[in-house]
Design a protein with these regions (language model features):
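Extracytoplasmic/periplasmic solute-binding protein
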Residues: 123-138, 142, 173-233, 277
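Hinge/lid segment of periplasmic solute-binding proteins
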Residues: 85-145, 207-211, 302-317
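A ligand-binding cleft/hinge motif common to bilobed small-molecule-binding domains
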Residues: 88-92, 284-303
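Bacterial N-terminal signal peptides
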Residues: 7-16
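Extracytoplasmic/periplasmic substrate-recognition and gating elements
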Residues: 21-23, 47-48, 130, 150, ...
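Extracytoplasmic "Venus flytrap"/periplasmic binding protein-like
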Residues: 23, 40-117, 121, 154-155, ...
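Glycine-centered hinge/linker elements that transmit conformational signals in sensory
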Residues: 176-185, 214, 219-262, 308-311, ...
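Extracytoplasmic "Venus flytrap"
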Residues: 25-40, 58-61, 140
């Protein structure tokens, strides 16, 4: 059976042509909460088609190696693959992914049914073209969680307002975020030393990029001249972009917990759940689990990436 792969997502759905008589198919993705939700959703698919869905979920640290090896070796483990959006270009150029326009037309799949940002980032190659190599499986974005129970303490609210002149709460911009992080840095609460924020610093994969671009986008950085593709000089290294990178570094140096120099999703979650930090940056996909696990007096609040010069956030993988 010939494979027809669709990339899908910061995660990208890779689809294979599936024999209508197939009794089961296998889907591969990363091991995390959204995969568990997808497992529930596929029950409807099985009830409607009679086709069982098997799953192989790979831990995030091993995910890219496992999936890319599968593609490079033309493996037959998966019928569907939810991979990373960063793979679309190489997948299209080196023949791992098939242009799906005719398939979409035949099956009545309209890209107008998807968020334009996810179509641009997760489906097209070259970006912005009408050449579709994937369907967006999950358009995740970067946001923040904070210890609302600490923020609601009258003594902390009074102290913060006396020092900064505004209320302790959801930060309106990155300057306020920094004020709040430094306010909690090294502070003792309930007999334990606390810190400001768990932010992305991991350098082995996309971690640091996903973190620092959250600031760069908020400062108004653009990757390239919007009227001239791949003309990056003066855009990606604009004064706003440089200021954002310097600010992110300052936030790390002044507000991160000890040893948080190579951290990404799991490390940020652990720092937050263990009570080390007042804030964590992470993906929206994790917030239901964080809220569900609130205990021992912990009350979590959530907010979108703060604006600085503009309101913007990092789209997963982008």
């Amino acid at each position: 059976m010939k494979k027809l792969i669709i990339l899908l997502f910061a995660s990208v759905l890779s689809l294979s042509s599936i024999n209508a008589k197939a009794k089961s198919i296998t889907l591969g993705w990363a091991a995390w909460d959204p995969a568990n939700a997808l497992q529930e959703l596929t029950k409807e698919f099985t009830a409607e088609t009679g086709i069982d869905v098997n799953f192989e979920f790979v831990p995030w640290p091993n995910f890219a190696d496992r999936m890319l090896n599968e593609l490079n070796n033309k493996g037959k483990t998966f019928d569907l693959l939810i991979g990373d959006s960063q793979w679309i270009g190489a997948g299209a150029v080196y023949g791992h992914y098939v242009k799906l326009n005719e398939f979409f037309d035949k099956e009545g799949i309209s890209m107008n049914d998807f968020s334009p940002a996810t179509v641009y980032a997760y489906s097209t190659w070259p970006k912005g073209s009408e050449n579709y190599y994937a369907l967006p499986a999950m358009g995740d974005a970067l946001a923040w969680a904070y210890r609302k129970d600490w923020f609601d303490r009258p003594e902390l609210r009074s102290e913060f307002k006396a020092k900064h002149g505004y209320d302790l709460g959801v930060p309106a911009n990155w300057n306020q975020l920094y004020d709040m992080c430094t306010f909690f840095q090294g502070r003792e609460i309930d007999g334990q030393k606390r810190y400001g924020a768990a932010i992305n610093t991991e350098r082995g994969s996309e971690g640091i990029t996903m973190g620092v671009t959250a600031a760069m986008y908020a400062w108004g950085m653009e990757y390239e001249n919007p009227n001239k593709p791949y003309d990056m000089e003066g855009y990606f290294n604009s004064p706003q972009a440089v200021e954002a990178v310097e600010f992110y570094r300052k936030l790390y140096e002044d507000c991160a917990p000890p040893g948080h120099s190579d951290a990404y999703m799991v490390a940020n979650l652990d720092a937050y759940k263990s009570g080390q930090v007042a804030f964590q940056m992470n993906w929206y996909a994790f917030w239901p689990g964080v809220s569900k696990e609130d205990s021992d007096g912990r009350v979590s609040g959530f907010f979108a990436n703060p604006k600085q010069n503009v309101a913007a956030a990092t789209l997963g993988g982008q």
